């Protein structure tokens, strides 16, 4: 994988890392909080990654002096696309609630009107079943999440191609139960991990498109003319059918059946993890 694409994926995965830091210390916006967290606490000095974290919102970009080919423009529009896909608005309430929990995606499925929420925790605490009780996402919990992320990222070399896999593991472990948005005007059932992963996926597609088309001025293409970009055929969606997979899993001999069942189930899980 090309170095520029690796940096887009890394920057996109980390672009909202300032949200846990900001919610734990509300003195700055989350873009600045994320930049300072990675630069000062974690020790990441790669400018191309840091720019994506600091300048992924319009109000930050328009007052910046970043280059026309900065990868920040890719993460900026990838974030907008991912946000458009995962934000479903409700009609009531305004403002933000920094203590908001992540809601279950099943709350509104099939016309449901439920209020199950996940306990604020990391994946190291085991299976987190949604509950109806209110447990606020305290400043202390956000601090623990930031400390865990910092400890893990400090031991990772961002110049190594394995960095992305390690980064995905860290984000999944610590941000799977952190809401991406704490706006009272949105349904908070998308985790920060899922949002960042979608942003990284979209960003990796965009850089492939730009390189294929020979486009080097990312500012003009993705920022100044962002509305026109949305109508371009920059993405290719594909699907695959694994119906009948049950036969593969369950058609096994009696001898060692439990071991075979577990291994085939694990194989399927890894296949989905790799493809999705």
Outline where the language-model segments fall.
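Catalytic-site or vestigial catalytic-site microsegments of nucleotide-handling domains
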Residues: 237-247
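Amphipathic alpha-helical segments in well-structured domains
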Residues: 27-35, 196, 265-269
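Conserved structural-core and active-site-/substrate-pathway-adjacent residues in large, well-folded domains
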Residues: 12-15, 79, 199, 241, ...
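Surface-exposed, low-hydrophobicity interaction/linker segments
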Residues: 255-276
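A short, charged/proline- and glycine-enriched loop
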Residues: 232-235
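Extended, Lys/Arg-enriched charged tracts that mediate electrostatic binding to polyanionic substrates
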Residues: 194-213
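Extended, charge-enriched "interface" segments that sit outside catalytic cores
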Residues: 122-188
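Divalent metal-dependent catalytic cores for phosphoryl transfer on phosphate-bearing substrates
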Residues: 1-130, 178-182, 230, 250-254
């Amino acid at each position: 994988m090309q170095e520029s694409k690796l940096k887009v994926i890394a920057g996109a995965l980390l672009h909202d890392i300032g949200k846990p830091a900001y919610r734990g210390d509300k003195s700055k916006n989350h873009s600045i909080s994320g930049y300072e967290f990675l630069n000062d606490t974690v020790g990441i000095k790669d400018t191309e990654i840091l720019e994506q974290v600091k300048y992924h919102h319009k109000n930050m970009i328009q007052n910046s002096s970043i280059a026309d080919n900065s990868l920040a423009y890719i993460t900026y529009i990838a974030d907008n696309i991912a946000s458009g896909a995962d934000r479903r608005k409700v009609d009531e309430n305004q403002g933000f609630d920094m203590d908001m929990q992540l809601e279950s995606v099943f709350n509104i499925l099939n016309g449901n009107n439920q209020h199950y929420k996940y306990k604020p925790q990391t994946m190291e605490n085991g299976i987190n079943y949604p509950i109806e009780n209110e447990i606020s996402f305290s400043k202390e919990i956000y601090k623990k999440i930031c400390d865990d992320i910092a400890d893990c990222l400090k031991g990772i070399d961002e110049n190594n191609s394995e960095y992305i896999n390690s980064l995905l593991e860290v984000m999944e472990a610590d941000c799977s139960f952190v809401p991406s948005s704490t706006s009272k005007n949105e349904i908070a059932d998308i985790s920060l991990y899922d949002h960042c992963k979608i942003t990284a996926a979209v960003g990796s597609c965009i850089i492939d498109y730009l390189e294929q088309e020979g486009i080097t001025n990312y500012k003009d293409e993705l920022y100044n003319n962002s509305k026109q970009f949305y109508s371009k055929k920059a993405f290719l969606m594909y699907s695959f059918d694994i119906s009948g997979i049950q036969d593969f899993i369950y058609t096994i001999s009696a001898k060692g059946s439990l071991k075979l069942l577990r291994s085939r189930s694990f194989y399927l899980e890894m296949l989905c993890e790799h493809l999705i």
